[in-house]
Amino acid sequence: MKAVVLTLAVLFLTGSQARHFWQRDEPRSSWDKIKDFATVYVDTVKDSGREYVAQFEASAFGKQLNLKLLDNWDSLSSTVSKLQEQLGPVTQEFWDNLEKETEGLREEMNKDLQEVRQKVQPYLDEFQKKWQEEVERYRQKVEPLGAELRESARQKLTELQEKLSPLAEELRDSARTHVDTLRTKLAPYSNELQQRLAARLESIKEGGGASLAEYQAKAREHLSVLSEKARPALEDLRQGLLPVLESFKASVQNVLDEATKKLNTQ
């Protein structure tokens, strides 16, 4: 639990925010991404699980056992869905509290990202401009060759390919040159961002020991509240599973009894 909140803040913020920093689109909330991923994962598990149960019951061994798991699966899925609905507000409250507690740290990280972005932006614009110029120059060189191809396609195909090959290599080499130049220019700013992040974490560890302990205590408190509020919903899930387990035990016992009778009569 040491630095749980710091790990969440740094991981989610520097990961998601940095990606949008390069793409220039509106960042989605890290908490929303986690909730969406959890929902998709649970739905996938339910769908794939139902498929496996159906395949098992369709097999010869499944027909012999006659466990009727598929009938109980829908009931179980309904119970799980009910559990999700009951836990929804609880988990939302947990993430809201955690997001609120790390707001100050996230704001500082965003400031650092914005400062570096402003410094780097001219180099990105320059790279984009040069790349567009290279593509336009390549297009102008290729266009006459395309006309040649249309005039005498079959006879000139080999010759055209030979002419295009060095042009493509030239474009590729130019792109590599521009990328290397951009990488060289951006390296100091990347190092600066890393140093700022390291300094920020170090200052929290050394000068903000109380804040770190406070983050840890609040995170534990939120987890404890989440556990207490989730307990009734988990109990409902357990009660919903009992009929499925009892049906399974009864079916297996019947199969064993029939097998024992057959062995005794032989």
Curated annotation (Swiss-Prot):
Residues with the Methionine sulfoxide modification: M109
Stretch forming the signal peptide: 1-18
Entry PTM: Glycosylated. Palmitoylated.
Region 10 X approximate tandem repeats: start-end pairs: 67-266
Keywords assigned by UniProt, alphabetized: Cholesterol metabolism, Glycoprotein, HDL, Lipid metabolism, Lipid transport, Lipoprotein, Oxidation, Palmitate, Phosphoprotein, Repeat, Secreted, Signal, Steroid metabolism, Sterol metabolism, Transport
Tissue-specific expression: Major protein of plasma HDL, also found in chylomicrons.
GO biological process, one term: positive regulation of phagocytosis
Function: Participates in the reverse transport of cholesterol from tissues to the liver for excretion by promoting cholesterol efflux from tissues and by acting as a cofactor for the lecithin cholesterol acyltransferase (LCAT). As part of the SPAP complex, activates spermatozoa motility.
Subunit details: Homodimer. Interacts with APOA1BP and CLU. Component of a sperm activating protein complex (SPAP), consisting of APOA1, an immunoglobulin heavy chain, an immunoglobulin light chain and albumin. Interacts with NDRG1. Interacts with SCGB3A2. Interacts with NAXE and YJEFN3.
Protein name: Apolipoprotein A-I
Organism in which the protein naturally occurs: Oryctolagus cuniculus
